Amino acid sequence: MANVVIYTTAICPYCVAAKNYLAKKGASYSEVRVDLDPVKRAEVMERTKRTSVPQIFIDDTHVGGYDDMVALDRRGGLEPLLAAQA
């Protein structure tokens, strides 16, 4: 299985939706709470050039946010990323 990392905050409904979506896909993930770690928040903002959460990475691929992940899945691109070897 791929290495999935999701950057979240406690009060973000799209973060909850993204975690639920990944769980339904059977994907395990590591969650990084950027509201609790300003250093991680700065790192993900620099890496993605985005200020919103969630931000989802599958291995070295930046998927984007929840809507981006769902759109990728509809195009058939999410399953291959999740199935890739880490």
Show which residues each predicted segment covers.
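Thioredoxin-like thiol-disulfide oxidoreductase module
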Residues: 34-51, 80-84
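ATP/adenylate-binding site constellation spanning eukaryotic-like Ser/Thr protein kinases
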Residues: 9, 50, 75
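Structural alpha/beta surface segment adjacent to cysteine/selenocysteine redox centers
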Residues: 25-28, 41-53, 57-63, 67
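Residues that form or flank phosphate/diphosphate-binding pockets in enzymes
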Residues: 13-16, 39, 64
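Non-catalytic, surface beta->alpha helical segment in thiol-disulfide oxidoreductase systems
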Residues: 58-85
